[in-house]
């Protein structure tokens, strides 16, 4: 219609994405006059696309690889987590001002709260240091976790995780953050025994995993005595 609001996904490639079908179904189910499209935008094209968002009044976008860092560099304002990580996966257009968010951590913490669990003052253990896991680490620290212990193999993510740990410490000095190799078995047992929250959560977004966990909700979550 003449008032249809436009939303989208930017990345490259995006032709395989299920996001348009999912989002447009949601618009229809909720009676929203909106349309969600996938835009194949390469990293070097992000600045021009951002200008187009203002020109065409695109209300918001999700951002996928390889554009998350470039998008963050072209925002008017970043959420605390996005600023710390230096990447965004969501852009919101409010009257021509673009706000960048990284929502993985926000969604994780919000879902815990929905299940009656808060992270403030808690000792947390996280396995993994990829993109989503990093966002979760950052959000838990920003939301008042007492300590965060990260275990990750010495893969390409490990060195990046070391740098992120130092950034979190500088931003949230009251939160104790440590990074260990997966081979540190004794430390792993010690930290798990001392942790306040044990969570088994599937944050993988692909067809195979959806067969086991179609809605990506918490599988097990409980407070330790």
Feature annotation, model-predicted:
Residues 143-172:
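NAD(P)-binding Rossmann-fold cofactor-contacting core
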Residues 11, 100-105, 120-145, 152-154:
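Glycine-rich adenosine-cofactor-binding loop
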Residues 107-112, 117-119, 131-138, 162, ...:
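Active-site glycine-rich loop that binds ribose-phosphate moieties when present
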């Amino acid at each position: 219609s003449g008032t249809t609001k436009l939303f989208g996904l930017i990345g490259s490639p995006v032709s395989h994405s299920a996001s348009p079908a999912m989002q447009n179904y949601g618009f229809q189910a909720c009676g929203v006059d909106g349309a969600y499209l996938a835009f194949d935008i390469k990293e070097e094209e992000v600045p021009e696309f951002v200008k187009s968002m203002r020109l065409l009044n695109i209300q918001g976008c999700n951002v996928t690889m390889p554009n998350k860092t470039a998008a963050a560099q072209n925002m008017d304002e970043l959420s605390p987590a996005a600023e710390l990580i230096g990447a965004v996966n969501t852009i919101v257009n409010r009257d021509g001002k673009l706000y960048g968010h990284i929502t993985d951590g926000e969604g994780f913490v919000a879902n815990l709260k929905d299940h009656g669990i808060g992270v403030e003052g808690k000792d947390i253990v996280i396995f993994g240091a990829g993109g989503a896991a990093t966002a979760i680490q950052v959000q838990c620290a920003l939301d008042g976790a007492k300590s965060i212990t990260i275990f990750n193999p010495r893969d390409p993510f490990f060195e990046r995780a070391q740098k992120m740990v130092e950034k979190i410490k500088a931003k949230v000095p009251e939160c104790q953050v440590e990074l260990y190799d997966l081979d540190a078995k004794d430390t792993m047992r010690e930290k798990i025994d001392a942790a306040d929250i044990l969570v088994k959560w599937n944050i993988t977004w692909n067809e195979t995993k959806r067969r086991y966990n179609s809605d990506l909700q918490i599988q097990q979550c409980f407070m330790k005595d």
